[in-house]
């Protein structure tokens, strides 16, 4: 019997590869099960359209508090996390504890990390804002001391310390917002890794389905009962002066963000639509 071999001819087959970060099994002690809501609320009503059908995932417990103070840790592995677009690092501490942290750009296996007020200004170290010089680039920032990081956690993002006065530090966030944060809050030095995630192509519709994103149907292709743009014979226009949402509100150009209460900690808000 003759075996005939063919070269791959589709972009997905030719260019897709499993990155080195995706070849590690997660630490079992730091994982737990995760149930997808598929865009439904507790009554089963769709509250977020075009969601559902994602690949089954395990949730990795990430240390956003960085409260292992003055204990040296070493990077054991850099791993893929399906629950976020940044990579994560498994840190092996000298006391035997293991924790996951966000992977800073430039950090590799075997590097040393430390969470301490006296830590050096190097990628991955966590220290209070009061100990950071002006111009330091940071990520994984707390809004309240001890609560855990809430800002600048996405892949490739970075904030900068631009001023310190009294008990507050002034930060420039990736969105362009400038806000005040208490100086005793912890932050990690450096930029979040996986900077080129925005350049990654999905290559096929199935890749989107693995991520839990379902197809988006045009309103003009629906029936009138389903969308204000629906109905008509053939490919007709939407029949409206302005495009509308499925719930009948004007969209595409009209500002939809509600007015915000005055927050004295926000010096300049980000640009919003």
Swiss-Prot record:
Its localization reads:
Plastid, Chloroplast
Q: Name one GO molecular function term.
A: rRNA binding
Where it mainly occurs, coarsely classed, is plastid
What SMART domains does UniProt report for this protein, alphabetically? Ribosomal_L2, Ribosomal_L2_C
Q: Does the keyword Ligase apply?
A: no
Extent of the signal sequence = none
**Biased composition, class Basic and acidic residues, residue ranges:** 14-24
What SUPFAM superfamilies would the database entry show? Answer: Nucleic acid-binding proteins, Translation proteins SH3-like domain
Residues of the region (Disordered) are: 1-51, 213-248
Q: Which GO terms describe its cellular component?
A: chloroplast; mitochondrial large ribosomal subunit
Keywords from the named record: Chloroplast, Plastid, Ribonucleoprotein, Ribosomal protein
The cross-references to Gene3D superfamilies, in alphabetical order and at most eight, read:
2.30.30.30, Nucleic acid-binding proteins, Ribosomal protein L2, domain 3
Matching NCBIfam families: rplB_bact
User: Self-association or partners: how does it assemble?
Assistant: Part of the 50S ribosomal subunit.
The entry assigns this protein to a family as follows: Belongs to the universal ribosomal protein uL2 family.
Q: What is this protein called?
A: Large ribosomal subunit protein uL2c
Source species = Adiantum capillus-veneris
